[in-house]
Amino acid sequence: MDLGAHFDREGAKLALEKFIQDRVNESKDAKETSVDNVVVHEVDRQASNRREWKLAALSGSEVVPEEVAFRLHGVLAKINLAPGEIAHLNAYKASSLTQRVQLVGLGSHAFDDMLLNTKVVTDILRRHLGGQHSPVWKIGEGYGDLQMNCSCLYLTKAFNRPEKEVPFGPGVDPFKKFARYKPQGYIHTAANVVKYFKRVDEEGKRVLYECFPGTFRVGNIVEVQGSVIAFPVKDGMVKMVFQMNTLILEDASFSKAAEHARAREYNPPQRPMQLKRKSWYEEEDEDMEVGGARRKFKDLRLETAHSYVG
């Protein structure tokens, strides 16, 4: 879905710039991991036979079990989320069923800098893998500037040592469509979970509330949390993807304004139709006692009512 001609791109860009700068200021006091302390950690995926690598942080001489988390902020340019995305599933594409979004900055320098800084992951992987693999980090272009795709598979193919199956989150599988893939060995694990939130201002505080994936619209300003995963592909290459685990709605005002503008264009306001009051009688006899006739109708209704009651 396109942002459309009614979307205030300049306003959204400026709002995104301010939002990213505010998040940077908030994180200055937070504990950050130096690039020198980041190492590549091979993931032990029990439900998959594919090799995967993630980033982990060093604490002294040991690797902290928590992976290095990333936070990205941008404007939603494309959405592929439940329930619309899974309303008509193809039974032969279970391995590619993905919840994903695409972020753009609409020319925001803060957004471009944020994405370019993530390329440091390529250097870290290259040092770890040496000449064995060549990492590929693809950041495309959309709407004239950089874009980032963030995704997470709905299902995992279970092999010899299946992971624990977990229930789907609120609004993710309302039609119970994924049950058909369980006989094929596909399950929903903790690695497939994406949590959806919207941030609300309450008494000067920003509070998170869980929401359905169907809440999100193209044009929303969002925060995506997740990790970078690398895995080998053909010809000795390593593909890197941003696997999201949290999507937060921060600002929906620009998408709502665009929707209202489109609605006004296709449904312009119309003048209310003037109705003329028409008499019950085509012609009134001058000798007719209208008041008496009305009294007769009134008495008739009362008599009828009494007859039913009696």
For each of these PLM feature ranges, what is it?
Residues E289-A293:
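Acidic, serine/threonine-rich low-complexity intrinsically disordered regions
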Residues D173-L247:
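Extended serine/threonine-enriched, polar tracts that run as long, contiguous segments within proteins
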Residues M1-R180, D235-E283, R294-G310:
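OB-fold ssDNA-binding interfaces and closely related basic DNA-contact patches used
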